[in-house]
């Protein structure tokens, strides 16, 4: 199965470096993250701009607070507005409106293959006002700022600042693997996404070196702390750069994992269809055998059919369904 998936990935263009690997969304996401940081201490204006984004495209603002009034918001939840289970058309519309309202210069992307998305029912990175601590959203903003600084300038001071805020946020309500998705959205070449698809892919020695797989397996059994997350992120890049894989960075890795999982899902759907078809056949296997026994072991199809109807006490409706 894995070898089939690898052929599927190569067929889609990994070895030839076609446009599928250009990831136009990265420029937009990175620029928007940088722009969002300017609202860290002016969240009231940010909330008004979010309302404008939705008004501009005649859509309702999603539920972001227990009441009707949004009193605060964090930057990862803002990214979650267009990285959750919505249609591609709505996603493009929201991003297009964001580009206008926030004056983003990067091209508005229209392809989002391989980008991890949130569950619509868990689309905020904070608990609603009665279920969160006073500094929860402030902490997320501090992590957001530290993550951008660390991604743009990897030194010991920025690494330590990132680790401090990551560990603080990791223990907050509504934070689980989604925090790694958020980090990936804002700086996809710097942070590895550890959603279920990537964890599955990274844990297979067909996709990554055995020593890497062994070193991270226990670390991804639960949401890692900062030390473990940084270990995984650094070890992954080292493994990718030192081996002959089609993927050389986190976006390519995530895209490969997405393609592989889609192939597996297609295989499961096909198998499910075959099982369903087999079950329909097996429904009549025993009655056919019994009918043949009853008529002495040899009979025309019409005689066997008549005997099955008699033995199974089939109604007119069932008989007609059988004909169809």
Regions found by a protein language model. Name each.
Residues 279-280, 309-324:
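Short, positively charged loop/turn segments that connect secondary-structure elements
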Residues 188-189, 292-297, 310-314:
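Short helix-capping/hinge SLiMs at alpha-helix to coil transitions
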Residues 13-172, 188-272:
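An N-terminal alpha-helical hairpin/helix-loop-helix interaction module that forms a charged
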Residues 6-12:
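Basic polycationic patches enriched in arginine
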Residues 275-303, 307:
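Positively charged, polyanion-binding regions of nucleic-acid-associated proteins
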Residues 179-186, 303:
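Short hydrophobic alpha-helical segments that form membrane-spanning helices or hydrophobic packing faces
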């Amino acid at each position: 199965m894995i070898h089939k998936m690898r052929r599927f990935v190569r067929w889609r263009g990994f070895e030839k470096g076609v446009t599928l690997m250009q990831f136009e969304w990265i420029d937009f996401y990175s620029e928007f993250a940088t722009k969002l940081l300017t609202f860290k201490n002016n969240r009231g204006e940010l909330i008004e701009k979010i309302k404008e984004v939705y008004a501009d495209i005649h859509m309702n603002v999603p539920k972001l607070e227990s009441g009707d009034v949004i009193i605060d918001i964090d930057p990862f939840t803002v990214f979650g507005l267009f990285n959750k289970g919505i249609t591609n058309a709505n996603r493009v519309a929201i991003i297009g409106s964001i580009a206008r309202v926030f004056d983003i210069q990067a091209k508005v992307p229209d392809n989002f293959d391989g980008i991890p998305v949130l569950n619509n029912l868990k689309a905020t990175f904070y608990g609603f006002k009665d279920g969160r601590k006073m500094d929860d959203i402030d902490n997320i903003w501090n992590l957001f700022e530290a993550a951008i600084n660390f991604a743009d300038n990897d030194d010991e001071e920025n690494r330590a600042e990132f680790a401090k805020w990551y560990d603080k946020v990791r223990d907050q309500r509504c934070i689980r693997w989604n925090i790694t998705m958020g980090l990936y959205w804002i700086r996809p070449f710097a942070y590895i996404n550890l959603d279920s698809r990537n964890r599955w892919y990274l844990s297979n020695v067909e996709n990554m070196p055995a020593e890497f797989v062994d070193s991270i397996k226990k670390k991804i059994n639960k949401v890692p702390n900062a030390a473990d997350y940084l270990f995984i992120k650094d070890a992954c890049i080292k493994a990718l750069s030192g081996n002959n894989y089609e993927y050389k960075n986190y976006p390519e890795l995530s895209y490969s994992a997405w393609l592989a999982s889609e192939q597996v899902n297609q295989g499961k759907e096909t198998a499910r269809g075959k099982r369903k078809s087999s079950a329909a056949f097996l429904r009549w296997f025993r009655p056919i055998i019994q009918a043949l026994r009853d008529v002495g072991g040899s009979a025309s199809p019409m005689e066997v059919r008549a005997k099955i109807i008699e033995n199974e006490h089939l109604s007119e409706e069932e008989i007609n369904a059988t004909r169809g």
